[in-house]
Amino acid sequence: MHQGSSEIVVLKPTTVFLAFLASQLPLNDVPDLASLHTDCTAYVINKHDSIEETVEEIEKNFSTMFRHEICRWLGNNARNDIETSFLDFLCCFKFELHSHIVLMEPTIEAGHQLLTIKPRALLLDWMRSEVEGEYELENVMEQATLSHLTENATVIVKNFPDLKEIKTFIKQYYRPIFETAMSRMSNQSSAWPEVNSFKSFSQYFAIEIHTQLIHLHY
């Protein structure tokens, strides 16, 4: 586990960014929102103790991030006034912050790709079943949503010279990945859902792939 001075922010484009792209691209070249949410860019930033400081860190680096996102979709020569506005940046992207980092490279600086371990709805159902009969915990879990579970989901920093290796890696190591993610939710491994195959693992967790992990503070 990486307990360092870094955390990771993943940028999720919004419909505002999609509308911006639509204003810049031929109609047939405009991506849909699902495409924008596939392989989102992940950025390594300095870790802070408060959300206010984290927002300040993002604001300090937003122009670099905004520029990169625009170039990803419009090409390196694209220029637009929107990239100078932090308010526009906030409208164009939602942030996912991750500080629970499993490092599989010598240093985080050496990492250039990222996997996010996202809980699925079946895991939330399991968590609710585990607190049945415990009134206070039942009330808490009834208010819980899948988005609560996916906040600060576990991420793995690992490089894949050939992207085809990713699926093989996940299939080979699904069990330790499962154990790492589950240990954050319950230390009673005997009570965990039974996962004895990649198929059963995939019922409880989805893997998001980020082929670009960009370091902003080095």
Predicted regions and their residues:
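Amphipathic protein-protein interaction modules
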Residues: 48-105, 153-217
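Extended, charge-biased low-complexity segments
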Residues: 1-49, 108-160
